[in-house]
UniProtKB/Swiss-Prot annotation:
GO terms for biological process: unsaturated fatty acid biosynthetic process. PANTHER family: 3-HYDROXYACYL-[ACYL-CARRIER-PROTEIN] DEHYDRATASE, 3-HYDROXYDECANOYL-[ACYL-CARRIER-PROTEIN] DEHYDRATASE. Keywords: Cytoplasm, Fatty acid biosynthesis, Fatty acid metabolism, Isomerase, Lipid biosynthesis, Lipid metabolism, Lyase. This is 3-hydroxydecanoyl-[acyl-carrier-protein] dehydratase. GO terms for molecular function: (3R)-hydroxyacyl-[acyl-carrier-protein] dehydratase activity; trans-2-decenoyl-acyl-carrier-protein isomerase activity. Its EC number is 4.2.1.59, 5.3.3.14. The keyword Transcription regulation does not apply.
Length: 176
């Protein structure tokens, strides 16, 4: 795998992310992002094949917060907060996106996480969530797998951290 795909860029806008969800960005054999309302980012500001804390790759993405986001209406009524699992899922989404960006093929699946810590919350009054992913390792064998650490920041404050985020790309998910 390498980053010599014809559509390689270092940043992606919302329309690009939607194209990924339709299988158009990295091709039909590449991993896809989910479509809205499960797509947890509005843009990817920076992707590098090197860099990050481990010099194995770095991703920075953002989600604009609006009070009318669907989860605020039901989680919880009278006490709206973005579910923490959605921030965790966003980090998995970005690891899978990185694997497609470097040329990986297959259907992306979250495989696990070492440790997650929540030290804050995302309320409808927030303005922006920033995700930072530090790739630790990419394995390219029968299974393509990415391993990374990540953090979620709201309005400049880190509120979630995750270690050993694992995402795999599968050619066949029928036995997964």
């Amino acid at each position: 795998m390498n980053n010599c795909t014809p559509n390689i860029k270092s940043s992606y806008g919302y329309e690009d992310l939607l194209a990924s969800g339709r299988g158009e960005l990295f091709g039909k054999e590449g991993p896809q992002l989910p479509a809205p309302t499960m797509l947890m980012m509005d843009r990817v500001n920076l992707m590098t094949e090197n860099g990050g804390l481990f010099d194995k790759g770095y991703i920075e993405a953002e989600l604009d917060i609006h009070p009318d986001l669907p989860f605020f209406g039901c989680h919880f009524i009278g006490d709206p907060v973005m579910p923490g699992c959605l921030g965790l899922d966003a980090m998995w989404q970005l690891v899978g996106f990185f694997l497609g960006w470097i040329g990986g093929k297959g259907k992306g699946r979250a495989l696990g996480v070492g440790e997650v810590k929540f030290t804050g919350q995302i309320l409808p009054t927030a303005k922006k969530v920033t995700y930072r992913i530090h790739m630790k390792r990419v394995i390219n064998r029968k299974l393509v797998m990415g391993l990374a650490d990540g953090e979620v920041e709201v309005d400049g404050r880190v509120i979630y951290t995750a270690t050993d985020l694992k995402v795999g790309l599968f050619q066949d998910t029928s036995s997964f």
